[in-house]
């Protein structure tokens, strides 16, 4: 499929970009130090540079790991077996844990969780409905599900996210669904979500973003109108 080719080419480009970024790091440090003296906040440009370098490096390490997992699973032959599925979830969890740990330390990111504790639903799968609130919120909720609630998420994603190589490769190897905001004739969105919900284990969580984009009053009104048109 086209996403495999794009994932291979895009993944190689990200790894090459990461190597180039590290080679030119002394120059970036000089530029960031210069800008930090002219921007508000304490060493803002240097902190953003560090987080960008970290994100690139983590993504490259994940891509290399995904290649290794593909080879180790018999070039994808055993990819759906429990061990290899767990290995992919572990890779995803490691990436998010390190990214958010550094974001908390470097950017003073603070995430407050309210509601039931992780022990509130022992042995039960979860259905999680989330509202988009801005950049990074999807990563935030997935990180909370994996590293706070110790869940393996099954996610309904917008199909445009397949263009991001790491997301496209990793999400296709795990039980997730990429959907179009305007399904083509013959595409039953409800059936796709229902198929994804079947067979949820005790440590699984089905994550859905019903609005499909950042919240606006107009988008909410249109979503309600679509549901009424469907008789829901």
List each model region and its residues.
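Soluble catalytic domains of membrane acyltransferases
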Residues: 89-232
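Membrane-anchoring hydrophobic helices of lipid-metabolizing enzymes
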Residues: 1-126, 140
């Amino acid at each position: 499929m086209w996403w495999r080719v794009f994932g291979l080419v895009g993944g190689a480009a990200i790894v090459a970009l990461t190597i180039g970024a590290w080679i030119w790091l002394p120059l970036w440090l000089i530029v960031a130090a210069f800008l930090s003296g002219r921007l508000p906040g304490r060493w803002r440009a240097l902190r953003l540079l560090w987080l960008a370098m970290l994100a690139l490096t983590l993504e490259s390490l994940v891509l290399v790991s995904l290649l290794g997992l593909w080879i180790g699973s018999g070039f994808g032959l055993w990819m759906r077996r429990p061990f290899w599925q767990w290995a992919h979830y572990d890779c995803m969890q490691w990436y998010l844990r390190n990214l958010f740990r550094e974001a908390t330390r470097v950017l003073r990111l603070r995430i407050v969780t309210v509601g039931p504790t992780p022990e509130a639903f022992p042995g039960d799968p979860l259905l999680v409905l989330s509202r988009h609130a801005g950049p990074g919120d999807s990563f935030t909720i997935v990180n909370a599900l994996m590293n706070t609630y110790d869940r393996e998420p099954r996610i309904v994603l917008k199909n445009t996210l397949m263009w991001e190589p790491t997301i496209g490769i990793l999400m296709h190897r795990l039980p997730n669904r990429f959907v179009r905001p305007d399904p083509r004739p013959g595409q039953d969105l409800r059936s796709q979500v229902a198929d994804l919900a079947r067979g949820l284990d005790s440590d699984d969580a089905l994550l859905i973003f019903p609005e499909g984009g950042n919240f606006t009053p107009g988008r909410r009104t249109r979503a309600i109108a679509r549901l009424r048109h469907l008789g829901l």
